[in-house]
Amino acid sequence: MTEHQNVDHAEIAKFEAIAERWWDLDGEFKPLHEINPLRLDFIANKTGGLFDKETLDVGCGGGILSQSMARMGAKVTGIDMGQEPLTVAKLHSLETGVNVEYIKVPAEQYASEHPARFDVVTCMEMLEHVPDPASIIHAVAELAKPGADVFFSTLNKTPKAYLYAIIGAEKLLKMVPEGTHDHKKFIKPAQLIAWAEQAGLKVRASAGLSYNPLSKQYSLNTDVSVNYILHFEKLA
């Protein structure tokens, strides 16, 4: 599969259709806004701080994480294949004065053009939306410098993840639009780690992300059965 084929146009269309509401704190992307501080803290902690680090956000969408990392002093580039989310991200960057470079380009192509460039690479909630997640993981590894910090987050392929992310979040609680996720595309941590190790990455830490529907609060913990985040180091 070439890099230009590793795009699910139906997935892109889902996010294009609602891109204008990316920064609406009570809209379809409310869960992303709510988990962002937890993701950001995890990344900042594992990297020892982001200040002045060349940082790439793969699958950046409307720029929620990208802009948060830039506010911490990182030199951030965000790449995505959705034009509307990138347009929203650029406008929000102009409105807030937070400097992020946004580019529409496949990760594989960008990796061939910028190998071993970045100190930090993030790829959050993207792998479950592409036809070939292993290809993205290899591109991310290629983009990272030796010793760089690399982060992936996605959904575990478990019955609990189906129950919580699709039945609960989509159908019952209406937290995200119905059809956002496909359980067949969820990825077990062992599979993600295997792909990452093949690409020259070494796992360093993991965390689970849980939602309490009673308190309506998210938390990081050791339960990786639904949402999880993995931290890797690029080997020399």
UniProtKB/Swiss-Prot annotation:
HAMAP family: UbiG (MF_00472). The keyword Transferase applies. Belongs to the methyltransferase superfamily. UbiG/COQ3 family. S-adenosyl-L-methionine binds at R39, G59, D80, M124. SUPFAM superfamilies: S-adenosyl-L-methionine-dependent methyltransferases (SSF53335). Gene3D superfamilies: Vaccinia Virus protein VP39 (3.40.50.150). It comes from Pseudoalteromonas translucida (strain TAC 125). The lineage of its organism: Bacteria, Pseudomonadati, Pseudomonadota, Gammaproteobacteria, Alteromonadales. Pathway: Cofactor biosynthesis; ubiquinone biosynthesis. GO terms for biological process: methylation. O-methyltransferase that catalyzes the 2 O-methylation steps in the ubiquinone biosynthetic pathway. It catalyses: a 3-demethylubiquinol + S-adenosyl-L-methionine = a ubiquinol + S-adenosyl-L-homocysteine + H(+); a 3-(all-trans-polyprenyl)benzene-1,2-diol + S-adenosyl-L-methionine = a 2-methoxy-6-(all-trans-polyprenyl)phenol + S-adenosyl-L-homocysteine + H(+). Keywords: Methyltransferase, S-adenosyl-L-methionine, Transferase, Ubiquinone biosynthesis. PANTHER family: METHYLTRANSFERASE (PTHR43464), UBIQUINONE BIOSYNTHESIS O-METHYLTRANSFERASE, MITOCHONDRIAL (PTHR43464:SF19). Pfam families: Methyltransf_23. Its EC number is 2.1.1.222, 2.1.1.64. InterPro entries: SAM-dependent_MTases_sf, UbiG_MeTrfase. This is Ubiquinone biosynthesis O-methyltransferase. GO terms for molecular function: 2-polyprenyl-6-hydroxyphenol methylase activity; 3-demethylubiquinol 3-O-methyltransferase activity; polyprenyldihydroxybenzoate methyltransferase activity. CDD domains: AdoMet_MTases (cd02440). The keyword Protein biosynthesis does not apply.
